[in-house]
Regions:
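A solvent-exposed, acidic/Ser-Thr-rich amphipathic alpha-helical stretch
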Residues: 53-106
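Short, cysteine-centered beta-strand-loop-beta hairpins and adjacent loop/turn segments enriched
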Residues: 90-91, 115-127
Length: 166
């Protein structure tokens, strides 16, 4: 696996062509190297932040499936997923904090932070964290997105002596 720092889990340099190293350029099809998968996720978020729905759609396979396990919602297909994002209420901005890609499994994960403001000017911005899992086809297009939106909560009492808060 490779993260956005460009260091491969096995210690190889990205783009290496060693046939013994799974997930490198020589053991995957074009468009599914770790760098290509990371690039696809970066392009997805860059386009979403810019509200460039044409570029956003270009990262998606026609049959993309979007899952939200916490609300048990599923969106099937590129057109519906584009509309879902275009029509999302309020204003939001995304910060990509980390992308990890696995070319051999044609999958990636991203951790993001969102700043969300409501439709009303007096509403205070809300900071949210999210974790996203992506799957890809052989061309490097996104075939699946699963989003988790964990909510912060106070820890249980009795472990203050073991932890530090941030």
């Amino acid at each position: 696996m490779t993260d956005t720092t460009g260091v491969t889990a096995g210690g190889a340099t990205p783009g290496t062509t060693s046939s013994t190293m799974p997930g490198t350029a020589s053991s995957t099809t074009p468009g599914t190297t770790t760098a290509a998968l990371r690039g696809a996720v970066e392009a997805y978020w860059t386009a979403a932040e810019a509200r460039d729905w044409s570029a956003f759609g270009a990262t998606l396979a026609e049959g993309v499936v979007y899952d939200l396990p916490q609300t048990r919602e599923r969106i099937l297909g590129k057109e519906r997923y584009l509309r879902f994002n275009q029509e999302y209420p309020g204003d939001w901005h995304v910060r990509v904090e980390r992308i990890v890609a696995d070319a051999e499994g044609r999958q990636a994960a991203a951790r993001t932070g969102f700043t969300v403001t409501g439709d009303q000017p007096e509403e205070q911005p809300q900071e949210l964290d999210a974790i996203h899992f992506f799957t890809f086809d052989e061309e490097g297009l996104i075939t699946g997105v699963t989003d988790f939106w964990p909510e912060s909560y106070e820890p249980p009492a009795g472990r203050e002596h073991l932890v530090e808060r941030y």
